[in-house]
Amino acid sequence: MSYPVVSEVEFLKEVRNVEGKAKKKHFKDDRVTSPFFSFIKLDEVENNGVLSIRFYTDFGKESREIAGKEFEFGEAGKYYEYIMFFDVVEKIEPGTYRYGIFVNDRLLYEGKLIIYEFE
């Protein structure tokens, strides 16, 4: 089984589907505050599956999952050049977090996200 490629990850103030295209609104100075939208684009997607994004506290041994979203996608036997996913993530306190992007529980991508106080 081949896995898709994560080609884009953004945390946005707003995102909408306008005629099949993502219309994005970024945070001023890229200072993400809660609530926010997670936007993920996968390339080279085969078959169906479940994409999830999970947010974790810090980077130490005591790290724990604090939020997450899941998206079912695709059909068995089909190929998609790309698929875009987006949804709002609510109520994450200001701080530094790490996140992981998984397809069928396999980690494909991870990163760090700073959530700022609402100004």
PLM regions and their residue ranges:
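Contiguous beta-strand segments within globular domains
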Residues: 10-46, 81-83
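Short, surface-exposed loop/turn segments at beta-strand-coil junctions that are enriched for proline
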Residues: 87-91
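Short beta-strand edge segments in extracellular beta-sheet folds
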Residues: 70-73, 114-119
